[in-house]
């Protein structure tokens, strides 16, 4: 079950989104053929917060509290997922937010994926550094002894990523061709 809300704007809406995901997890637990519920990190917190963390900029006291609330929203969903043996898949975000999301999700995996994978992250292989990220996640899971839950995808934000790189005069974060993306994806599948 997928709760496809992203880009919410206020704390009440973020709380409501977390409650909806928890209800979807309970529904998935009662449905034999629904092993996962899916949500977006941006349904639990402001995009600007993820972007700021991703850019490793210092957070204000208010932003630190907002970040804690984001983590707590995720944590409540993870508790429901673990209690009812249903997977919670965190869908991918744009590149300028994804590292911040990865940090949260990996910390939650460390907390909830002790006996099996319950929390899952998404690795986008259209990103040039997709396999490097995958290997870093695997290394951390091995070092810290938790089960790594992953969904491998080619990617979803190609036009946005190209436009962002051009606008900012940056090297593109995505592979140049579909065949490069396919090679990245195949390498990731072989690694797993």
Map each language-model feature to its residues.
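Positively charged, amphipathic and often flexible ligand-engagement surfaces
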Residues: 2-192
């Amino acid at each position: 079950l997928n709760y496809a809300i992203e880009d919410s704007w206020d704390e009440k809406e973020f709380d409501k989104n977390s409650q909806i995901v928890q209800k979807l997890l309970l529904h998935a637990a009662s449905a034999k053929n629904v092993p996962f519920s899916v949500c977006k990190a941006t349904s639990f917190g402001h995009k600007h917060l993820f972007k700021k963390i991703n850019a490793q900029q210092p957070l204000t006291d208010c932003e630190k509290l907002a970040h804690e609330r984001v983590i707590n929203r995720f944590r409540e969903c993870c508790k429901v997922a673990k209690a009812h043996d249903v997977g919670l898949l965190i869908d991918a975000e744009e590149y300028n937010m994804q590292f911040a999301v990865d940090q949260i999700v990996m910390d939650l995996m460390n907390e909830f994926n002790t006996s099996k994978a319950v929390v899952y992250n998404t690795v986008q292989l259209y990103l040039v550094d997709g396999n490097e990220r995958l290997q870093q996640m695997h290394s951390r899971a091995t070092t810290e002894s938790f089960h790594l839950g992953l969904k491998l995808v080619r990617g979803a934000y190609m036009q946005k990523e190209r436009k962002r790189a051009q606008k900012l005069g940056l090297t593109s974060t995505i592979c140049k061709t579909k065949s490069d993306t396919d090679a990245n994806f195949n390498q990731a599948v072989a690694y797993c």
